[in-house]
Amino acid sequence: MFPLNFHYEDVLRQDLLLKLNLANVMEVPGLCEIRIVPKTSSTYDFIIKNGKLAMEILRGQKFIQTERGSTGKSFRSNPFLESNKDKGYVSDLARQSILRGHGMSNFLVRILTVMSLLDSRVEIRENSIQFSMETEFCEFSPELEDHFEIFEHIRRFNVTIVTSANTQDETLLLWSGFLQKDEGESFKWKTP
């Protein structure tokens, strides 16, 4: 059975999809990828040392390191990790981790399972949904709880769910169920 079957049957109801008045079913927006970036409260060295392991545990798949240039230095900044040009070198880990395919589906099932229990601010953009998973997310995930010493210095994970939607309204319509809490109230969300 498709891991997100419940999401498509219970959250993405057909009446919502029909409101889009799409001529072709291939035009219905879908999920492209999930981007995950850890934010820490301690030193930059901690990110290099333990961040890789934390990402492997959280994502459920091995972290793949990309090739560096011949100089071994990069001066690109990453606003998610609050890194900047003064630090000189930005490791491959400082760049966001991207999930696609089966790993993405499994991680999304986990997110959808606990999001209604967490108090996260959700931001809907043109073709993406952005939110932060605080450390309280560990309480709902046994493998994170078992390795809490690795996660104790990570303040949160910034998560971006990228869709193939063309407008913010399409994204909001398709993911409106994602914003519902168990008690019937809605998540706090904002537009850019």
Swiss-Prot record:
InterPro entries: Ribosomal_uL5 (IPR002132), Ribosomal_uL5_dom_sf (IPR022803). One of its GO terms (biological process) is translation. GO terms for molecular function: structural constituent of ribosome. One of its GO terms (cellular component) is mitochondrion. SUPFAM superfamilies: RL5-like. It comes from the Eukaryota. Keywords: Mitochondrion, Ribonucleoprotein, Ribosomal protein. It is found in: Mitochondrion. Its main location: mitochondrion. Belongs to the universal ribosomal protein uL5 family. This is Large ribosomal subunit protein uL5m. It comes from Oenothera berteroana. The lineage of its organism: Eukaryota, Viridiplantae, Streptophyta, Embryophyta, Tracheophyta. The gene is RPL5.
